[in-house]
Amino acid sequence: MFYIDYFFISGLFALDLEFSVGENGKSLDDNNTVLIFGGIQGDEPGGFHAASLLLSDYNITKGKIIVAPNLAFDSIIKRSRGKNGDLNRKFASISPKDPDYQTVKRIKELILLPEVSMVINLHDGWGFYKPTYIDAMQNPKRWGNSSVIDTNEINASKYPDLESIATQTVNSVNASLVDPKHAYHLKNTKTQELGDAEMLKALTYFVISNRKAAFANEASKNLPVNLRAYYHLLAIENYLKTAGIEFTRTFELTPQGVDKAINQELEVKLFDDKILLSLKNPRQVINYVPFPVNKELNYNTSNELTAVIAENNSFYIQYGNRFQARLYPEYLEFSNPFNEVTFQVDSNETTVPFGTKVKVKENFLIPKIANVRVNIIGFDHSKDESNILVSKKNMQKPYSLDMAGKIYRVEFYELRGANLQQFLENSVESKLIKNAKILDLATLRTARAKDKFIGSILVEFE
């Protein structure tokens, strides 16, 4: 997949993105939930991708995990270690005036949940930790490919023997190495014993100070992202098994399987799921995307690392630290007379909800709807493109969402003056696009002179 990394896109201003928290599984009321963090530093994609997959592609069948995959979300988007300093050095004390104060407060609240008994923090570090010096990238001062603990043992009701659990995890990971050079080792920082000023400020030390087990898993920044995430997941799965948590996943746990999972098709749904953007090797620019003047700018995504961000007169979609597409809006009034339409797909009639995708082998047709016009982006036949049989050869490839020229938008509009009966919209849990510019009166007047947007559907040709 082709990406351009626009980590300079937003300059220095704050994006105000809050980290996500997801739950997977069901608590057995035994205070045995495992809490997993990723992305505490924004330049460590192996960790935050591994954490994200635990929510999108794992199914916890026994027990429960809580995952916050994108702790420093602004920094992840900007590919920065920490826009307000190192977030992982703010757990001993933090000023209420610090921009990260609320973030640290939320993280601590998760750690202190009574149900949480084990915490795993995912990192990517340069080089490979080795107990004895080999060379500049393989020595005791490096962090990559290590299981990190703060001390051998803690006073905890569950999982007090940190060294034993981490050693078993190291052995488990080393049984599935891609290359012997990637071997994991146990790294005990002996934080309190040595009075390590930096590690005393870290998240894991805060955890063990509250009598809960904490492990940091480090993958090497010298490895590709998919391989880092692979090693993270090997370690995580062993910790989950230690806690008696059972699971399935949608992909094979191999470097290739992880790569495919990380780079799977992204979905972004806009404005109460009226619009779906299916991003499969997407075009860098998507023009004339309907944006409402009479409702909030909200969205949902298929994973917790994807965000829609306002920037000047446009918006862009970012997946972790990878740029996906820039959206140029067309501001319109939105209408809600219905939320699904009839399609004829390859001679079969079907009902399709807005914000979904239909696969087409040969052709499709949208029956005429009274007081509604259909606009098939890339077809360019007439003002209303209903009751027309459309095949792939009729489409103009530059207007597709994807570089392959297979995915196209089909939009539905209420004719101006039709005044169709409105129905109550379904409430959809969503995120808000923050920092969008305030629209001027000219833009509002122009929007109110146009047909009203109802919703859209994607068609994907074989």
Language-model features, listed with the residues they occupy:
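Structured catalytic-domain cores with a bias toward divalent-metal coordination
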Residues: 12-462
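Bacterial N-terminal signal peptides
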Residues: 2-10
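Universal eukaryotic N-terminal targeting presequences
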Residues: 1-2, 462
